[in-house]
Design a protein with these regions (language model features):
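N-terminal leader/linker segments that initiate helical-solenoid repeat arrays
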Residues: 10, 15-101, 428-450, 460
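Solenoid-like repeat scaffolds
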Residues: 51-59, 82-93, 104-107, 116-126, ...
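TPR repeat positional signature
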Residues: 65, 94, 99, 131-134, ...
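Structural register within alpha-helical repeat arrays
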Residues: 68, 99-102, 134, 165-167, ...
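Residue at a conserved register position within TPR or TPR-like alpha-solenoid repeats
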Residues: 72, 138, 169-171, 223, ...
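Structural motif corresponding to the intra-repeat A-B loop/turn of tetratricopeptide repeats
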Residues: 75, 105, 141, 172-176, ...
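Catalytic glycan-binding domains that act on GlcNAc-containing polysaccharides
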Residues: 91-93, 100, 115-121, 294-304, ...
Length: 682
């Protein structure tokens, strides 16, 4: 079937009468998971998950002794923890949970030989969560024989681990420090690794005859770039006099960034970076853009990309599209989120502003080939389809739209489905039938049961981030939908919806399978004026349905309300000012009322969602800078979303919209599901 993106290009939304909304910006912050809070009843009924048989449900009950064992471990009372574990219904599992928590909290207290023995005999434990912590705990005091044995079991994944392995082999005379190959490797690892001060001093003392002036210069540079000027200053005292002036200048700039302008002429990359970073906070103009264009970084690519991101956005605002494109080039990145970001923006600017689809394809294709997660895959595939469509290659456009449409939980996957199916009803939980089949063995399923139970007890003990990380391991076991639904059912049945939601998010993004249990619907919304799908989508994105969630910025509850916003709404709704923090019903009432007010003000779903995340003040600025999405076609609205300067808000708008589509299908199963296009038009 041909895809007809052009059929939407002239559409625009209908504006509603606007009334004033609460103009309270909502600063964001990282969720804080491990602080104790008083639990209140949540306004949710018991969930109903269809198509799950009794055999597929995890048949676990609460064991107070397992909970006690974890509690004692948190207090560092190992004897009591082991005693409680022995009293439990499953002593082997309970003792494993104790050990997992000990490794997570402080692996340096456990001998490497014991860590190896534990992981070998408990192969269900998601070791990739703990290996970096274990490596980071290794130091000069670690027994070199144990260290070498450990790295025989788990080869080092960090420069720190590689350095200490080489150091141990040198100490054990398994590596000859007199050989240039060993000396070169040691120097390279030291130059690119940060240690604590006492470790650095031991390294210098032991290997001072190995390190060269070039090593010192590169190590000083590394430390300065990584915000450790204190030890860099100590190292500078070892430099010959002719190298000290530049090192002194860089150290001064590191401590006093505002002085960077004095040393611009030194042509040093760090000084130029600091100068331009300072400028980005006060004066982003043509000179700033020109200066950035002239620099092709030799390292620290992610830091430079953040600056270039600011520069190309300003160039777009000035309609200097070529300069904007130039700033996306020579980024030096090879993988990861920043790489995907840089390649996508290069392709997007080439396609939408320079009208050069061939250049765009040259960016979107490597993005698709070098990313793994559904969000990035679907985004690259969708824009490849648009680029091929613009190049009048309908066959390849159709191919890439179909590729993108596999990722049914994502914004761009849903856009591709809308293009291919029009108004035809689509069950997003069907997805790719091949992906629904389990590729796992019985051993994988047995591992999953233990992982599910471990996450359950850790979450209840307020180790929420650790529980989420453990849940994120499950999709790697290649389970089918039935097995994933069973795990979600277990969490929902025990009122731990956040873990069911996290499992759903991870499954959708890593194994591309959507599960119904990850989309809770039975939340009481009182006096709602907008589709219930919106409120549920916001709750899912804000808190994972965790009514005790709070962020470092102070946002609280299911809808992550900020204190100022909640206080203003409390007066209007005649509720206590602090009720949003402890009463889930009040939190939902205030949050849904705020969304209603925002929609009443803007008459547009995109602006409403963006304002809920970033505040109405920012949204007003963006409308002035980038245009009014209420007067735009669908593709222009998509471009408007991608123009939002805050990455969190950009992603937030897309996430809420994609959640709305799924919820709309679940809440109104009797009629054709509204495609994401329809929600973009609201």
């Amino acid at each position: 079937m041909a895809f007809g993106i052009t059929c939407y290009l002239c559409m625009s939304c209908v504006c509603l009468d606007a009334t004033a909304a609460v103009d309270t910006a909502k600063p964001r912050g990282k969720n804080i998971h491990n602080k104790k809070q008083t639990s209140k009843s949540i306004p949710l009924n018991k969930p109903v998950i269809q198509n799950i048989t009794k055999q597929e449900v995890y048949n676990f009950g609460d064991d107070p002794n397992i909970a006690a064992a974890i509690s004692f471990t948190m207090k560092d009372d190992l004897a009591s923890a082991v005693a409680a574990a022995e009293r439990s219904g499953d002593p082997e599992f309970a003792k494993a949970a104790v050990e997992v928590l000990r490794i997570y909290n402080n692996p340096s207290k456990i001998a490497l030989t014991k860590l190896e023995a534990f992981l070998k005999t408990h192969n269900w434990v998601p070791e990739e969560i703990f290996i970096p912590k274990i490596e980071n705990s290794i130091n000069y005091a670690t027994n070199p024989d144990e260290l070498v044995q450990w790295f025989d079991y788990k080869p080092p994944g960090t420069n720190r681990g590689k350095f200490f392995l080489l150091n141990a082999n040198i100490r054990l005379r398994k590596a000859d420090i007199s050989k240039e190959e060993i000396r070169s490797k040691l120097r390279s690892l030291w130059r690119s690794t940060e240690f604590d001060s006492s470790t650095e001093e031991k390294i210098i003392s032991e290997y001072k005859d190995v390190f060269t002036v070039d090593d010192l210069l590169k190590k000083i540079d590394f430390l300065i770039w990584n915000n450790n000027p204190a030890f860099a200053q100590k190292l500078a005292t070892f430099l010959p006099s002719k190298y000290r002036p530049l090192a002194t200048s860089k150290l001064e700039v590191a401590k006093h960034p505002e002085r960077a302008y004095k040393y611009w002429g030194s042509n040093d990359e760090f000084i130029k970076y600091i100068y331009l970073r300072n400028l980005s906070k006060t004066k982003v103009d043509k000179n700033f853009i020109k200066s950035l264009e002239s620099i092709q970084p030799k390292g620290n690519y992610e830091k430079w990309w953040k600056l270039k991101n600011i520069g190309f956005r300003e160039a777009l605002n000035n309609k200097d599209f070529q300069a904007a494109y130039n700033l996306t080039q020579h980024h030096g990145l090879e993988a990861g989120a920043a790489f995907a970001d840089a390649e996508w923006y290069g392709g997007w600017i080439a396609l939408e502003f320079l009208k050069n689809p061939d250049k765009a394809i040259a960016h979107f294709l490597p993005m698709y080939e070098n990313t793994k997660l559904a969000n990035s895959k679907s985004k690259a595939a969708y824009w490849l389809a648009r680029a091929y469509f613009a190049a009048k290659n309908l066959e390849k456009a159709t191919f890439w739209y179909k590729k993108a449409s596999m990722y049914t939980s994502t914004f761009y996957g849903q856009l591709s489905l809308a293009e291919s199916r029009g108004g035809v009803r689509y069950n997003y939980f069907d997805g790719n039938q091949e992906l629904n089949k389990s590729l796992s063995t019985q051993a994988d399923k047995d591992k999953t049961k233990k992982i599910v139970l471990l996450a359950y007890y850790l979450f209840k003990a307020n180790y929420k981030m650790l529980a989420y990380n453990i849940i994120d391991h499950i999709p790697k076991l290649h389970l089918g939908r039935v097995d994933l639904e069973a795990a979600a059912f277990f969490f929902n049945k025990r009122d731990l919806r956040p873990l069911a939601v996290e499992l759903g998010k991870s499954s959708a993004n890593r194994s591309f399978i959507l599960i119904k249990g990850a989309y809770p619907t039975n939340v009481r919304i009182v006096n709602s004026k907008l589709p219930k799908a919106l409120y549920l989508a916001v709750i899912r994105q804000e808190s994972n349905f965790d009514h005790l969630a709070f962020s470092s910025a102070g946002a609280r509850g299911l809808m992550q309300l900020m204190p100022k916003t909640a206080s203003v709404l409390a007066s209007k709704l005649r509720l206590p000012k602090d009720a949003y923090a402890y009463d889930p019903n009040a939190n939902i009432l205030k949050g849904s009322t705020y969304l209603d007010q925002l929609y009443s003000q803007y008459g547009n779903m995109i602006l409403t969602i963006a304002a809920y995340n970033a505040g109405p003040g920012n949204v007003q600025k963006w409308v002035k800078l980038f245009g009014d999405p209420r007067k735009m076609s669908v593709i222009q609205k998509i471009n408007w979303i991608e123009t939002i300067p805050f990455s969190e808000t950009r992603n937030y708008v897309k996430k809420v919209l994609e959640n709305m589509v799924i919820y709309d299908m679940m809440l109104v199963p009797s009629h054709n599901t509204r495609s994401i296009i329809k929600f973009l038009e609201l």
